[in-house]
């Protein structure tokens, strides 16, 4: 009987190889194939040295493989009977297009599961000693993509609405739109003296 494949969308955590979950590591060590994004720690890939390895790097402005091709690759590997780890930085379902891959696999009838990872939206502030919630200061936090701002598109929630919130605002992929984000927030009433931190390459050995 033909072996039925399975695809796990595994969050690698943020940066250091030892931030992956125990379950994610075990799946990586036992899989038949791994499809991995850019910025994955080579030490993690070494845990799957026995497996087929397929790079599918995606960084701003540099996509080595279109998303549609990644979806097709995952479906093809799963349908061939392999146990596949789709290794993604952070958490696959937090601005990682994991939802798109999950739906593509479901549509093709390939069994799949998401294995959560530590997202940069909490890991990077934590590494800088910044809690995203703090009693008496921030009772909530909001994660927003900053990438579409540079095209002039409206963000998932308008910046004007976000400016009125009292929680911590975490913008991912927003470095190139930093001036626009700050200007729109202050124009909408966010006090200019609001504490802020800007981190570039927060999952790198020496973030700026």
Model regions and ranges:
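Class I S-adenosyl-L-methionine
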Residues: 1-17, 22-118, 123
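Short hydrophobic/aromatic-enriched beta-strand-loop microsegments
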Residues: 52-58, 109-113, 132-142, 189-198
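Short secondary-structure boundary/capping segments
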Residues: 25, 44-45, 76, 132-134, ...
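Non-catalytic, surface-exposed connector residues within folded enzymatic/regulatory domains
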Residues: 22, 38, 135-137, 193, ...
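Class I SAM-dependent methyltransferase SAM-binding "motif I" and its flanking Rossmann-like core
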Residues: 91-165, 208
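A contiguous loop/helix-start segment that scaffolds small-molecule binding in enzyme catalytic cores
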Residues: 4-7, 79-84, 145-208
């Amino acid at each position: 009987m033909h072996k039925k494949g399975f695809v796990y969308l595994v969050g690698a955590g943020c940066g250091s190889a030892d931030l992956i979950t125990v379950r994610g590591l075990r799946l990586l060590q036992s899989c038949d194939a791994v499809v991995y994004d850019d910025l994955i720690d080579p030490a993690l890939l070494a845990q799957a040295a026995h497996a087929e390895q397929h790079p599918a790097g995606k960084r701003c402005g540099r996509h080595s493989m279109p998303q549609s091709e990644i979806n097709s690759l995952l479906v093809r590997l799963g349908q061939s009977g392999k146990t596949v780890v789709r290794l993604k930085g952070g958490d696959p379902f937090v601005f990682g297009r994991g939802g798109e891959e999950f739906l593509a696999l479901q549509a093709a009838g390939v069994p799949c599961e998401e294995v959560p990872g530590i997202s940069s939206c909490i890991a990077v502030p934590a590494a800088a000693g910044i809690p995203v919630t703090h009693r008496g200061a921030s009772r909530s936090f909001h994660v927003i993509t900053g990438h579409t701002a540079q095209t002039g598109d409206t963000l998932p929630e308008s910046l004007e609405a976000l400016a009125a919130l009292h929680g911590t605002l975490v913008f991912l992929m927003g470095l190139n739109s930093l001036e626009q984000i700050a200007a729109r927030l202050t124009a909408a009433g966010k006090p200019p003296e609001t504490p802020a931190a800007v981190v570039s390459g927060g999952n790198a050995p020496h973030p700026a």
